[in-house]
């Protein structure tokens, strides 16, 4: 796994429409694969839940971002050669840690399009993307693949703002402040967390401020977009699911017994 190691959106309103929506983890079509269109073979209408490892495979470039209305957009990405070999319409790809469904494939074999629903635009940093900007990507894991990071679902819980970056000779320390402070209870020192789809190890946690830090090694900075992030930038955060279950179970147990 990667070693331990643009503005924030703490509001619960939709970033492009100003409409309030209830917060929930984002899953942009990874459960149901319906009405796929464009070039290429189609998958069955329902496919198993996608799984990712948190090991970012590389960077893709935004070729276009179309706002089809105030609650729906289409994102087209350009990928390195052969990245999309064997991919089908309906396949799942993690883009900055957000599970998206391929809805179109380019004739050149290096581009794919994804539809972004209102919840994705509100809850992630994808709605702020500009043409030419780079994003992290990971194709869904297959049976037999090594889980070198930790299990990542692609369901983004919130965004976080970069509030501090400290470079040393061989490492970079990055401090994040989560947009939803209630989630900081699930962020534990030495625990896993997904940051823009990267499986990282948490360093220190400041629960009062809703902050945590990670340390990034040179390879992580080279392969992912985290190497280009600066103070004020935003990232997508996915809490590690087992940690969330354990914390919630303990809290419920103690509450039932009046502890």
What are these regions (language model features)?
Residues 37-259:
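Conserved loop->alpha-helix
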Residues 1-36:
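N-terminal chloroplast transit peptides
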């Amino acid at each position: 796994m990667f070693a331990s190691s643009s503005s924030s959106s703490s509001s619960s309103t939709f970033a492009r429409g100003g409409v309030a929506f209830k917060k929930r983890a984002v899953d942009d079509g990874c459960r149901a694969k319906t009405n796929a269109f464009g070039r290429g073979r189609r998958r069955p209408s329902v496919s198993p839940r996608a799984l990712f490892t948190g090991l970012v495979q590389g960077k893709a470039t935004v070729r276009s971002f179309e706002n089809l209305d105030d609650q729906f957009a289409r994102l087209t990405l350009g990928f390195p050669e052969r990245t999309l070999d064997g991919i089908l319409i309906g396949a799942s790809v993690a883009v900055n840690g957000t599970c998206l469904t391929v809805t179109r494939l380019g004739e050149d074999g290096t581009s794919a399009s994804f539809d972004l629903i209102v919840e994705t635009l509100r809850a992630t940093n994808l709605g702020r993307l500009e043409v030419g900007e780079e994003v992290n990507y990971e194709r869904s894991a297959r049976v037999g693949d090594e889980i070198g990071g930790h299990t990542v679902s692609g369901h983004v819980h919130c965004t976080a703002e970069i509030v501090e970056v400290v470079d040393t000779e061989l490492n970079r320390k990055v401090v994040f402040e989560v947009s939803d402070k209630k989630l900081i209870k699930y962020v534990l020192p030495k625990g896993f967390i997904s940051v823009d789809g990267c499986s990282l190890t948490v360093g220190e946690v400041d629960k009062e401020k809703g902050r945590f830090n990670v340390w990034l090694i040179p390879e992580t900075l080279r392969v992912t977009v985290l190497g280009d992030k600066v103070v004020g930038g935003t990232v997508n955060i996915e809490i590690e699911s087992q940690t969330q279950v354990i914390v919630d179970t303990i809290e419920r147990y103690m509450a039932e017994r009046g502890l």
